[in-house]
Amino acid sequence: MAPVTIEKFVNQEERHLVSNRSATIPFGEYIFKRLLSIDTKSVFGVPGDFNLSLLEYLYSPSVESAGLRWVGTCNELNAAYAADGYSRYSNKIGCLITTYGVGELSALNGIAGSFAENVKVLHIVGVAKSIDSRSSNFSDRNLHHLVPQLHDSNFKGPNHKVYHDMVKDRVACSVAYLEDIETACDQVDNVIRDIYKYSKPGYIFVPADFADMSVTCDNLVNVPRISQQDCIVYPSENQLSDIINKITSWIYSSKTPAILGDVLTDRYGVSNFLNKLICKTGIWNFSTVMGKSVIDESNPTYMGQYNGKEGLKQVYEHFELCDLVLHFGVDINEINNGHYTFTYKPNAKIIQFHPNYIRLVDTRQGNEQMFKGINFAPILKELYKRIDVSKLSLQYDSNVTQYTNETMRLEDPTNGQSSIITQVHLQKTMPKFLNPGDVVVCETGSFQFSVRDFAFPSQLKYISQGFFLSIGMALPAALGVGIAMQDHSNAHINGGNVKEDYKPRLILFEGDGAAQMTIQELSTILKCNIPLEVIIWNNNGYTIERAIMGPTRSYNDVMSWKWTKLFEAFGDFDGKYTNSTLIQCPSKLALKLEELKNSNKRSGIELLEVKLGELDFPEQLKCMVEAAALKRNKK
């Protein structure tokens, strides 16, 4: 771990704390000041009786004046999704606050998704007063929101930590159930450090009476900032040189190396260095499904999204030409690895860069070397600095060119003359709708499979739950992304071809079935003045499930809604802040997309309901379903 440095204090209050180290503040205030110190500027959640005393400190003068914002959501699950989206966009810690049992359990699915996809989220849960769990006079009482014992609950007290036990070491990298106010500040800071270190969610259970208790300001004085760089494991100088020398020797001897950009590159904040390395070396580069947009896909040596045998044949063939694969931010799972169909050129060498190891595999010699306990982020930064491009010996096939949207070679049986909107039409049309620097949030659904093979414009940020795949997640995640874009403007842009005065659009691609699960958060987006373009793909139900099984079964149907009438119910009573349009033909879609693409308006919500066929599946979805079926049949 890097040494923690004391940064300069940025305001008068911090200077006051330095001069008065014995100063005390309420613990509730400490929590919110610590959140501000890590650049978490908004908190999501729902009030409940066990967290109200904590929430009151949002309005203490020192916290309120510093700009910490409460974003109340319609339910706790959506708060978890929003906190997830906040972190995915900003690479800061997203935070939600819920109440004992009924609130925290509602959020659990969202937290599980963050855990599965390495998203930094802090879940603060207000629990019963400390005396209720410690005192023999109270601990045997069955409390509301707390499940009783399975047997003899009239005689045995409940397990006050039952929910803590559900999440510890299961969907959280760090959990603190606060019981001693003397160590509470340290426990808060330790959970935050673990969230940064592992890039996974953490929990803090705060007793209702702790918020008002006094704590010292020592931690805020001694460590005024905690950053991800402070929390990851660094190699020694000797280790660093040894690793870099081994990596560069392999690169210099390679004729056809490839860089594979994966999701953990984004989670550990080094995507910019990966793109600099690509620009400096001119090495062919590919993205994974979950690493989509980690690489600037407008670069001249971008070769497409590699997903093994489930990806495009041309991309697969080009990847197979590479004698060395540098896999940055590697995350191995069935979705991200094409149901484990990744293959390499015979005798290729592979280097995997992971937050906990660097792995070098020489398939020709049949051996490998593993450097354990080392985060790849400092390795990537140092590799970019030290690599000598004059020593590269690249000999790529000159007939192979950059991947573009034309590479998809989509077959349209109607030759563009269809009067209905098809998945093929969308794959040809939607990439042109996107501008450099835009932010796209995509729901789990059929269209998500199409987006994989888009060649994105420069500096576009793509956010989607590619592995856990909980439908309904994207809409409240877009709320979190929109809040993060307000708190951390243009955080995703590092150079590229984005116009200097361009204000990025937030675009949500949403399915009708998924939207019905979390649609109410559109009202929160409206309340928070988040500019949003939301496109509802209306194909009358659960299209992915129809592709897998039961295409005409009633269990894949949903009730039809008047999507263009939603906002009157959700708070825009006179239509001043929203505009909704029903689109059923390609020509009308083209006109509307062109209007939005070229508009400078960044206020209000534009909703497009786009009618699609119930049984119209992208080819990428068909391929995945066939691969999954083949895997099932082999068992």
From Swiss-Prot:
A biological process (GO) annotation for this entry? methionine catabolic process to 3-methylthiopropanol
Q: Name one Pfam family in it.
A: TPP_enzyme_C
Report the principal subcellular site.
Answer: cytoplasm
Names of the cofactor(s): Mg(2+); thiamine diphosphate
Any stretches that span the bilayer, and where are they?
none
Pathway, according to UniProt? Amino-acid degradation; Ehrlich pathway
* Location relative to the cell: Cytoplasm
The UniProt note on the cofactor reads as follows: Binds 1 Mg(2+) per subunit. Binds 1 thiamine pyrophosphate per subunit.
SUPFAM superfamilies from the UniProt entry: DHS-like NAD/FAD-binding domain, Thiamin diphosphate-binding fold (THDP-binding)
Question: What is the E.C. number?
Answer: 4.1.1.-, 4.1.1.43, 4.1.1.72, 4.1.1.74
Applications (biotechnology): Fusel oils are important flavor and aroma compounds in yeast-fermented products contributing to the quality of beverages and food. In low concentration they are generally desirable, whereas high concentrations may spoil the product. By adjusting growth conditions and substrate their production is sought to be influenced. Phenylethanol, having a rose-like aroma, is an important fragrance in the cosmetic industry and can be produced by fermentation.
Task: Keywords in alphabetical order, please.
Answer: Branched-chain amino acid catabolism, Cytoplasm, Decarboxylase, Isopeptide bond, Lyase, Magnesium, Metal-binding, Phenylalanine catabolism, Thiamine pyrophosphate, Tryptophan catabolism, Tyrosine catabolism, Ubl conjugation
This protein's superkingdom?
A: Eukaryota
Miscellaneous comment text of the record: Present with 6560 molecules/cell in log phase SD medium.
The UniProt entry's sequence similarity note says:
Belongs to the TPP enzyme family.
By what name is this protein known? Transaminated amino acid decarboxylase
The scientific name of the source species is: Saccharomyces cerevisiae (strain ATCC 204508 / S288c)
